[in-house]
């Protein structure tokens, strides 16, 4: 999972104006980087130009996904990521960046601004921080921890059982389980195994 580009643009009446952008092109060869950066800048501007105000969209371009959010105040943002990167995290990043940008940069400067004149330096740190969606996004982090816990729990249950022993056999042998509990276990086991392929 990788983020390649994070851009902030102003959607004008005829074209989009790039205000600030940052790129992580380390996965491309040195000789490709300038061409790739130009392509990403062009694509970001084109997507913002063609997006309606107040809209969010994800556009597939080859093996990349371009996530765009254009606010009602004509401020737009684009994240270019690989197809594995979670889109929900991209839109969270765009929300955060555009809110922060609109607080720090006066809206009067948006139509005529350029990367050289706009004083906003947080894009690099946001792109670096969001490279790992699990660390950057609380929801993704909780999901990863939950998946880890399920794996540990499953492994713990397997290790509790002795070699060759099955949970079904233990339930049958148990003196502490009542007949009703044993019947419940068998019924649940049958219902859960109805979809298994033999």
UniProtKB/Swiss-Prot annotation:
Domain of life: Eukaryota
Subcellular location: Cytoplasm, Cytosol; Cytoplasmic vesicle membrane; Golgi apparatus membrane
Positions of the v-SNARE coiled-coil homology domain: 138-198
Family annotation (Pfam families): Longin (PF13774), Synaptobrevin (PF00957)
A Gene Ontology BP annotation from the UniProt entry: protein transport
Membrane topology label: Lipid-anchor
Occurrences of domain Longin (ranges): 8-131
Gene3D superfamilies the record matches: 1.20.5.110, Longin domain
Modification note: Palmitoylated; catalyzes its own palmitoylation. Palmitoylation is required for Golgi targeting. Farnesylation is required for Golgi targeting.
Lipid tethering residues (S-farnesyl cysteine): 195
Residues linked to a lipid group, S-palmitoyl cysteine type: 194
Keyword Protein transport: yes
SMART domains to which the protein is assigned, alphabetical: Longin
UniProt keyword list: Coiled coil, Cytoplasm, Cytoplasmic vesicle, ER-Golgi transport, Golgi apparatus, Lipoprotein, Membrane, Methylation, Palmitate, Prenylation, Protein transport, Transferase, Transport
GO molecular function: SNAP receptor activity; transferase activity
Free-text comment on this protein's domains from its UniProt entry: The longin domain regulates palmitoylation and membrane targeting.
Function: Vesicular soluble NSF attachment protein receptor (v-SNARE) mediating vesicle docking and fusion to a specific acceptor cellular compartment. Functions in endoplasmic reticulum to Golgi transport; as part of a SNARE complex composed of GOSR1, GOSR2 and STX5. Functions in early/recycling endosome to TGN transport; as part of a SNARE complex composed of BET1L, GOSR1 and STX5. Has a S-palmitoyl transferase activity.
Protein name as it appears in the record: Synaptobrevin homolog YKT6
Organism name: Danio rerio
Gene: ykt6
